[in-house]
Amino acid sequence: MTNGNGTPPEAAAPPQLNVLAQYTKDLSFENPNAPASLAPQQSQPAINIQINVGANNLAENEFEVTLSIEGKAESGSTVLFSFELAYAGVFRIVNVPQENLHPLIMIECPRLLFPFAREIIASAVRDGGFPPLMLDPVDFVGLYRQNLERAQQQGQPS
């Protein structure tokens, strides 16, 4: 069966993911012990990073996805620096089956946002007087699965 122009119906409307906007929602960098924290350290600081993804349905086929990244660098009990970034994008997603929509929003959209968020953090840390912090790539599939498991254990919908 064809749709009148010789193509099968499923080929008539390919899935589409468009980035409509990207923006910093919130950015905070703290260097609470400067200038002492800028002195050379005896050892590598311990760096703790937390990453979360959130999404809101703005309109039919349009979603805001927010990538939240928080981090802290400590040397012993001294905080060298800390940061928080909420970086978001508005995405238009059409012709995607409903069962694939949630994973697409929570995996692929943050994967597209991450390089930009990484650069913002690297620049903020550098501008704070430290070497740029280059975040390692994030396994958004693993993060998605982890969040699904946590939601199921708590009896919440994903």
From Swiss-Prot:
Keywords assigned by UniProt, alphabetized: Chaperone, Cytoplasm, Protein transport, Translocation, Transport
Biological processes annotated in GO: protein folding; protein tetramerization; protein transport
Subcellular location: Cytoplasm
Alphabetized GO MF terms: unfolded protein binding
Main location: cytoplasm
Function: One of the proteins required for the normal export of preproteins out of the cell cytoplasm. It is a molecular chaperone that binds to a subset of precursor proteins, maintaining them in a translocation-competent state. It also specifically binds to its receptor SecA.
UniProt family annotation: Belongs to the SecB family.
Protein name from the UniProt record: Protein-export protein SecB
